[in-house]
Curated annotation (Swiss-Prot):
The name this protein goes by in its record: Kynurenine 3-monooxygenase
Membrane topology category: Multi-pass membrane protein
Cofactor(s) named in the record: FAD
Matches recorded under Pfam families: FAD_binding_3
UniProt gene name: cn
Similarity section: Belongs to the aromatic-ring hydroxylase family. KMO subfamily.
Length: 455
């Protein structure tokens, strides 16, 4: 495949760019920077994911939506088509009640848009393989960042098999190294850098519903949810006909399950339809082999330091995984940055990136928190389903005006903060309309009573 290099309008200068983190966002950013003609060094503290069976500590599948698809498409390398060729479309949520009965909530009854379940490892491999085709990208695996002097553009890395560190220098350092970003830890020390983090009291464990006779055990084209008030379970389909199951519960509930008998009793009570699909022996093995993982939300700003350093993806805005937007938001970071670099000099582009992105990043972090409450509890309520039906009806009538919150987040590139603003005016309009009906109803009732008494 031939690689076409593009030029930035902001500057003709070619820079040496160091990207820390070769995950989904880091490898995508490397491709965009390389297409501009920059010399890119991509550093990853893990070994090459293409030589590993699993990506340790990370969910093995993800939900790809419009923002991520746009980032893949704009590269012009055919990556979106390659991803979708093996991805599994999910057209809605399938809700499992405590009796094992199911109901379906379609994401987009109007335009039939859907999410796509993609394998993290497969997508990462695809991006890294694309990086290999660029002569101006060099990948450095087993390089853990230990020091960063962003003012001087100096980096130091540690390798697992060597006592001596590796030193590097770059014109621009880009941190794509996740929620526990080593580069961000260096930026925190600089004046004017604001940072907050919040752990939630919920942990998660990953389980598996295996394939049976090489077929899915549940309908594959849905995100499956078992809402149970203050805890829940979800399942996404995999390409091998299995489902990755995520059990999310408060840590005290995890701690209360001390032995296999209590675990089977718990699943019999709360997830009776899932238990035979997972299998008792496999459930016991998977549940007790690891401790539940913590979840946190991170907000920080600014995302840049002068024209020297920048944070993207989870390094800039880690979020809980319940809106399926972590990867998509990170990829959208890259497309926004790319558009600014096409128009502005580097330092101005980085400043504009922070200015244009921070409110949207904060917004999606908040939405992810909200969606956890929705998925575990609100989806069971009749009020939620009525609102969903009303949103769908209004969306059919006014598709350019009345875009439901979930649709605007998942199926458009509307800024996240505007998605929230839209939802607020929709809520206000519905509430005022509801109050108007009450006032009119009371007026009609009062008039009828008056007419009956005094005619």
């Amino acid at each position: 495949m031939s690689v076409i290099l593009t030029e930035t309008n902001g500057s003709d200068e070619r820079r040496k760019v160091a990207i820390v983190g070769a995950g989904l966002v880091g490898s995508l950013a490397a491709l965009y920077f390389a297409r501009m003609g920059n010399q890119v060094d991509l550093y990853e503290y893990r070994d090459d994911v293409r030589k590993s069976e699993l990506v340790q500590g990370r969910s093995i599948n993800l939900a790809l939506s419009q923002r991520g698809r746009k980032a893949l498409s704009q590269l012009g390398l055919g990556l979106e088509e390659q991803v979708l060729s093996t991805a599994i479309p999910m057209k809605g949520r399938m809700l499992h009640n405590i009796q094992g009965k199911t109901s379906v909530v379609i994401y987009d009854p109007c335009f039939k848009q859907c999410l796509y379940s993609v394998g993290r490892k497969q997508l990462n491999e695809l991006l890294l393989n694309a990086c290999d085709k660029f002569p101006n990208i060099k990948c450095h695996f087993d390089h853990k960042l230990t020091k960063a002097n962003v003012k001087e553009g100096q980096l130091e890395f540690k390798r697992s098999h060597s006592v001596e560190g590796v030193k590097a220098k770059a014109d621009l350092i880009v941190g794509c190294d996740g929620a526990f970003s080593a580069l961000r830890q260096n930026l925190i020390k600089l004046p004017g850098f604001n940072y907050t983090q919040e752990y939630i009291e919920t942990g998660y464990l990953e389980l598996c519903i295996p394939a049976k006779k090489n077929e899915f055990q549940m309908p594959p084209n849905y995100l499956h949810i078992w809402p149970r008030d203050n805890f829940m379970m979800i399942a996404l389909p995999n390409q091998d006909k299995s489902f990755t199951v995520t059990l999310s519960m408060p840590f005290d509930i995890f701690a209360s399950i001390k032995n296999p008998e209590e675990l089977i009793q718990f699943f019999t009570q709360y997830y009776p339809d899932a238990l035979p699909l997972i299998g008792k022996e496999q459930l016991i093995k998977d549940f007790f082999k690891t401790k539940p993982q913590h979840l946190l939300s991170i907000k920080c700003r600014p995302y840049h330091y002068e024209n020297k350093a920048l944070l993207l993806g989870d390094a800039a805005h880690a979020m809980v995984p319940y809106y399926g937007q972590g990867m998509n938001a990170g990829m959208e970071d890259v497309t926004l940055l790319n558009s600014l670099l096409q128009q502005l000099p580097l330092e101005e582009a980085l400043a504009q990136y922070t200015e244009q992105r921070w409110q949207d990043a904060f917004a999606i972090c908040d939405l992810a928190m909200y969606n956890y409450v929705e998925m575990r509890d609100l989806t069971k309520r009749w009020s939620f389903r009525c609102r969903k039906m009303l949103d769908t009806w209004l969306f059919r009538l006014f598709p350019t005006i009345w875009v439901p919150l979930y649709n605007s987040v998942s199926f458009t590139s509307m800024p996240y903060s505007k998605c929230i603003a839209n939802r607020k005016w929709q809520d206000q309009l519905l509430w005022r309309t509801f109050l108007g009906f009450i006032v009119v109803g009371l007026g009609v009732t009062g008039s009828a009573i008056y007419w009956q008494r005094f005619r």
